A protein has these predicted regions:
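Asp-based, Mg2+/Mn2+-dependent phosphohydrolase catalytic module
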Residues: 1-20, 48, 134, 138-141, ...
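Conserved SAM-binding loop
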Residues: 28, 147, 206-207
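Short phosphate-binding/catalytic loops that engage adenosine nucleotides
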Residues: 103, 140, 145
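Short, low-complexity, disordered segments immediately C-terminal to signal peptides
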Residues: 129, 147-149
Length: 269
């Protein structure tokens, strides 16, 4: 049964889920494997641009700590800036750490060019999936569910990641923090995903791993939020239902089938 043939509401009058909106890093992408080498290199370069007389006052480890990354172990705080925000936000946080009169990160053209070069060198073609993503995403798409991506990364970077992983054709739209709809937890990007697919928020589920994802879902008033976390104890907000916590997308089709309000359940019946 195709989605276009499936009634907008089930027999009990409950809205049928038609759209799944995904966060990217930590959900589709392995955040640590893909982006940790990049942010380490950018932190090192940032320190290299400080005046010689400030040497020793601030190190790359300090910059990383300010965004929730432990330089020694590589541990990433799931509630930290690195896990949930863009490089623009990271640079704003770092700017406040720098000595007075130091480089202006956001406006220095040479700095921005070098950062972009580091991203291209270290990340392009080196996207690492968070487990098997092709099978579950392909199954959901084949069943008729519409898939969209909402990330606080920039749109071009997100498109590149999806292309690297071979799943770009499954997602429409792909919305980044620079796409003109704000950044999460602002709900406008999520609302745009709904509008672009012609579905109501009551027919939409958000899948994410951070407080920003959850707050965007809550603000948009979508039907539900599914959390990617290794354990329910690690979910970003206790209001998230423990039964909605899964360690990876590999378990997402099974979880959706169990809900009884998606096209997957209809196909199984």
């Amino acid at each position: 049964m195709l989605l276009t043939q499936f009634a907008g509401r089930d027999r009990k009058g409950k809205a049928v889920i038609k759209l799944i909106v995904f966060d990217k890093d930590g959900v589709i992408l392995d955040l640590s494997a893909t982006w940790l080498p990049v942010v380490r290199a950018v932190a090192d370069y940032t320190i290299s641009r400080l005046p010689p007389e400030t040497a020793g006052r601030l190190g790359a480890a300090d910059l990383l700590a300010s965004i929730g990354v432990d330089a020694a172990s590589g541990w990433i705080d799931p509630a930290g800036i690195f896990a949930k925000d863009s490089f623009a936000v990271i640079q704003s946080v770092w700017q406040r750490q720098l000595p007075a009169g130091a480089i202006e990160l956001r406006s220095d053209a040479q700095y921005q060019q070098k950062v972009n070069a580091l991203v291209l060198q270290l990340a392009r073609g080196k996207s690492h999936p968070k487990g098997d993503i092709k099978t579950p995403l392909g199954d959901l798409y084949a069943a008729g569910l519409r898939l969209a991506l909402l990330t606080n990364d920039n749109e071009a970077s997100a498109q590149q990641n999806l292309s690297d992983l071979g799943v770009a054709q499954l997602f429409s739209p792909v919305v980044g923090a620079d796409s003109g709809h704000g950044a999460k937890p602002d709900p406008h990007g999520l609302l745009f995903c709904c509008a672009a697919n012609g579905v109501d928020v009551s027919e939409t589920i958000m899948v994410g791993d951070t407080m920003a994802d959850y707050m965007a879902a809550k603000a948009a008033n979508v039907a539900d939020f599914i959390c990617i976390a290794e354990d329910a104890a690690h979910r970003p907000n206790p209001a998230i239902k423990p039964e909605n916590v899964i360690p990876s997308l590999e378990l997402l089709p099974e979880l959706l089938r169990g809900r009884g309000d998606t096209i997957l359940q209809a196909n199984a019946s």
